[in-house]
């Protein structure tokens, strides 16, 4: 990936709250299925904003490092009735669409949303907030840490 898009906690919360607004009224939802790990963070915001307490997870591993997506491994699948009807499936990002296709097969009746979407996968989700170019790596706030940076005069 040649470009980077750095997301701060403030930006992330703002975007996740905007996504929550689009999911109102909350009474239509039975719960949330968070795609682990990236979907855990927006799931917490959605749960708070929509007043939902029933949160499940689906654990799918696909990224092995910043540049390489590998074969999908379903490590855990939430057991919900009726193909996920009445549930929101949430992930931080839809990228190539590989994970999204697997999710769609597992929960065909759920509402599938992400905070960010790249062109190759955008059509696979029901809603998202921010368009990201395909060749851009997203640096999410939970993957970053604060470190000391020396003054320019000391370099």
Swiss-Prot record:
It comes from Haemophilus influenzae (strain ATCC 51907 / DSM 11121 / KW20 / Rd). The gene is gpt1. Signal peptide: none annotated. This is Xanthine-guanine phosphoribosyltransferase. GO terms for cellular component: cytosol; plasma membrane. Mg(2+) binds at residue 92. Keywords: Cell inner membrane, Cell membrane, Glycosyltransferase, Magnesium, Membrane, Metal-binding, Purine salvage, Transferase. It holds the Pfam family Pribosyltran. It catalyses: GMP + diphosphate = guanine + 5-phospho-alpha-D-ribose 1-diphosphate; XMP + diphosphate = xanthine + 5-phospho-alpha-D-ribose 1-diphosphate; IMP + diphosphate = hypoxanthine + 5-phospho-alpha-D-ribose 1-diphosphate. One of its GO terms (molecular function) is hypoxanthine phosphoribosyltransferase activity.
């Amino acid at each position: 990936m040649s470009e980077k898009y750095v997301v701060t906690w403030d930006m992330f919360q703002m975007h996740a709250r905007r996504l929550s607004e689009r999911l109102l009224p909350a009474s239509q939802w039975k719960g949330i299925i968070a795609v682990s790990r990236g979907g855990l963070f927006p799931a917490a915001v959605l749960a708070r904003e929509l007043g939902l307490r029933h949160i499940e997870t689906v654990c799918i591993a696909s990224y092995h490092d910043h540049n390489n997506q590998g074969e999908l491994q379903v490590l855990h699948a939430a057991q919900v009735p009726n193909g996920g009807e009445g549930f929101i499936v949430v992930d931080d990002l839809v990228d190539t669409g590989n994970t999204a296709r697997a999710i769609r097969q597992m929960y065909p009746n759920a509402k599938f949303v992400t905070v960010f979407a790249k062109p190759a996968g955008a059509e696979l989700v029901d809603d998202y907030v921010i368009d990201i170019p395909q060749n851009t790596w997203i640096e999410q706030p939970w993957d970053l840490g604060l470190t000391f940076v020396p003054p320019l005069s000391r370099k």
